[in-house]
């Protein structure tokens, strides 16, 4: 018999620590790219971790100048080591790429097993026909991209957002008003790092999104300015174009601006191409609700086709209802609230509601309502100022 002793065994997995997040995982799609033999095949997604990753793929400024430029922009805004998928497409339009049935956007999401959170689409070719202030292809792609993104969310259970490069900018006055649209999974960015350019600095935007937690507005001043030392709207600097910037912002475009007293450039806001009163009319709301949807799906999937203890009238027994609600709320609070991604009261940022009067025996359907508590954002701050005197 062994000598008497006390043995301590360390248990693991009790803290409920959430796994590493892929919230900022994006795909950068560049139309008009050139293949590089077996190392970089068009239509195939490649994961990179910095500009140096392009060397092994055979991607250079000589064969893919626009792609190299955008990857450099991306990593100027976020740390090297941040994963990014790049996809080169030989030719075509944004509209054709985003087509749910005949384009490549849905197959891209499928091929990456739903990992992607957003798809950023740029084009290295000429802007082509301009309509309502920017390239006609961009405007025609927006509703098509919305349909594809909704398909990914509703059918593939892989919700995404799509950002289109607002190419061929001509004037803010003639821009289509995106705030009148209903594309709450689509955004359009304008403004570039070069004067009189057909392009938009979508790599800068992608990097800022990837570097920001889901609840953080890309224009948050406390996060500091964007990296470019000069940014342009058409042929003039953003500094000299603030009237046009305001007009474009009011029409729902993602666009850089300046703040008096601060150096550098900041995004005005993070609008999607829809009515700003839409619950998901901002990228922060879109990313927040999509993450909650992914977590809820993964949690509830465990219960699919499981036996459910019922009452005599076919309704769920109360302990079962409570356990389901607790499981969903715990998953959301562990993976979101504890990260500061939801507004918390008493440690919880969500509420899961299951109507206990549902006749599950008759319908085999259980309706679940999940509500998460978002943050508010100070989009306007009004400060009244005057003199402090004995008369007041």
Model-derived features: positions:
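Short, ordered beta-strand-loop transition motifs
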Residues: 20-22, 166-167, 194-198, 356-366
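Residues that form generic nucleotide/phosphate-binding pockets
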Residues: 57, 70-77, 295, 299, ...
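Conserved, well-structured core segments that form the ligand-binding/active-site neighborhood
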Residues: 116-245
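Anaerobic metallocofactor- and corrinoid-dependent redox/one-carbon enzyme cores
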Residues: 2-33, 232-252, 256-258, 349-351, ...
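Compositionally biased, low-complexity/repeat regions
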Residues: 84, 89, 95, 345-392
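Long, contiguous, structured domain-core segments that constitute the functional module of a protein
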Residues: 208-327, 369-392
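C-terminal structured domain segments
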Residues: 313-371
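Small-residue-rich
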Residues: 1-174
């Amino acid at each position: 018999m062994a000598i008497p002793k006390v043995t301590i065994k360390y248990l693991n997995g009790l803290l409920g620590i959430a796994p590493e997040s892929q919230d900022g995982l994006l795909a950068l799609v560049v139309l008009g790219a050139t293949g590089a033999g077996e190392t970089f095949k068009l239509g195939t997604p490649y994961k990179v971790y910095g500009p140096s990753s392009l060397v092994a793929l055979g991607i250079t400024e000589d064969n893919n100048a626009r792609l190299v430029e955008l990857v450099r922009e991306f990593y100027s805004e976020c740390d090297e080591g941040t994963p990014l998928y790049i996809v080169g497409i030989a030719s075509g339009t944004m509209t054709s790429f985003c087509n749910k049935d005949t384009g490549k956007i849905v197959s891209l999401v499928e091929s990456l097993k739903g990992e992607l959170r957003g798809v950023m689409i740029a084009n290295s070719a000429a802007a082509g026909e301009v309509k309502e202030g920017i390239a006609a292809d961009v405007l025609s792609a927006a509703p098509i991209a919305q349909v594809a993104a909704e398909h990914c969310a509703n059918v593939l259970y892989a919700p995404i957002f799509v950002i289109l490069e607002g190419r061929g900018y001509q004037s803010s006055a003639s821009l289509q008003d995106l705030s009148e649209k209903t594309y709450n999974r689509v955004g359009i960015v304008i403004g570039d790092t070069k004067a009189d350019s057909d392009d938009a600095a979508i790599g800068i935007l992608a990097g800022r999104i990837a570097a920001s937690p889901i609840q953080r507005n890309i224009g948050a001043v406390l996060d500091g300015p964007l990296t470019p030392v000069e940014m342009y709207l058409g042929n003039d600097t953003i500094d000299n174009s603030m009237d046009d910037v305001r007009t474009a912002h009011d029409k729902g475009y993602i666009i850089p601006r300046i703040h008096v007293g601060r150096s550098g450039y900041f995004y005005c806001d993070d609008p999607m191409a829809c009515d700003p009163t839409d619950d998901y009319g901002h990228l922060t709301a879109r990313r927040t609700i999509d993450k909650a949807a992914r977590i809820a799906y993964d949690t509830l999937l465990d219960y699919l086709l499981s036996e459910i203890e019922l009452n005599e009238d076919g309704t769920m027994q109360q302990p079962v209802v409570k356990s389901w609600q607790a499981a969903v709320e715990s998953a959301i609070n562990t993976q979101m609230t504890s990260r500061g991604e939801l507004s918390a009261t008493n440690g919880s940022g969500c509420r899961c509601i299951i109507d206990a009067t549902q006749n599950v025996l008759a319908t085999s359907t259980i309706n679940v309502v999940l509500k998460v508590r978002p943050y508010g954002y100070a989009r306007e701050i009004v400060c009244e100022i005057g003199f402090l005197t004995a008369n007041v």
